[in-house]
Amino acid sequence: MANSDDDDAFLYSDEEQEVEKQGPKVKRVKFADEESNKEEDKTNEKEQQQQKQEASNSESGSGSGSESDSGSESDDDIDIIIRDTQPTKSKSSGTTIIGNEALSEMTDPEESTSSSSTTAAAGTTTINKRQSSSTINLESVPRYQQEEDGEGDGTLITQLDIETLKLKPWRAPGVDVSDYFNYGFDEFTWLAYCHKQDKLRGEFNPQKVMENIMKGPGGAVGANGTNGINLGDKTGQQQQQQQQQQQQQQQQQPPQPPMGMMMPPPGFMANMPMPPMGSMPPMPNMANMPNMANMPNMANMPPPPPGFNGQFPAPYNIPHTMNQKQ
């Protein structure tokens, strides 16, 4: 055992002495003052991490240089310096510049609307100019004129007689009639349409139509365009009210008597007394009335007059049987 201890001491004594001379290896880490900023956003944290990595790389490079110069320090001696990175003013100014540029790129809505309105107005003016520059009159009736065949004297197309034309290509077999007549017309319906249009244009009188419209259900049209009454004037309204009142009174009054008869005073028939039935005077010759033939005797009936034989003179002497036959 002693020999083994001696051998170990002989072999490893030099290394232990060198370790004691050199001392324990210490890792030196330098920390700068850290100030915590909890309000930083995620973008600043990423930038801090990048800066930490760059600082560690730079410090590792400087440490390796010192170790190579001294030769006494090993690769384990690493100096790490952590710096407190704060957002600089340049970054804030950069953000403000970006905001200003973005604001400068934005346009004023009023200016944009005004520019669009001006362009729209310009467009409408150009359209109006184009419409005004057109020489085609849509209300005019075209005239027939064909210079190639030497036909046509400028007559209206509605008054043109088709039979006078030399060429009638629409009558050829297999020809499409729509190539010569529009809107579904053919030769016969076109002629009927032309005659109808000429008749309507001849009978049409705008002034007469307006008079009929202005008359309405009333009478003749006055000078002011109404039925003899100026509705805009107060006197005209009063006259109209008086006419309505007169019409109502006429409807309420009883009918007038015929010509030559006097109208009884009002309330005459209502206040007129009627005579009593018992006080009527007796009629003359009522008591001496004769008894008629085949008449049953009635109670309280007076006797017939003297000399009456029961027969009436002609033409009142008709037998009773003849009256029944008739």
Curated annotation (Swiss-Prot):
Main location: nucleus
Stored Pfam families: Fip1
Pro residues bias: start-end ranges: 254-267
Compositionally skewed regions (Acidic residues) per UniProt: 1-18, 70-79
Region (Disordered): 1-138, 215-267, 302-326
Gene Ontology CC terms, in alphabetical order: mRNA cleavage and polyadenylation specificity factor complex
Biased composition regions of type Low complexity, renumbered to the chain: 50-69, 112-126, 236-253
GO biological process, alphabetically ordered: mRNA processing; response to xenobiotic stimulus
Protein's UniProt keywords contain Nucleus: yes
Biased composition (Polar residues): 85-98, 127-138
Keywords attached to this entry: mRNA processing, Nucleus
Keyword Nucleus applies: yes
UniProt biased composition (Basic and acidic residues): 30-49
Subcellular location: Nucleus
Domain of life the protein comes from: Eukaryota
Family note: Belongs to the FIP1 family.
Role according to the record: Pre-mRNA polyadenylation factor that directly interacts with poly(A) polymerase.
Full protein name: Pre-mRNA polyadenylation factor FIP1
Species this chain originates from: Candida albicans (strain SC5314 / ATCC MYA-2876) (Yeast)
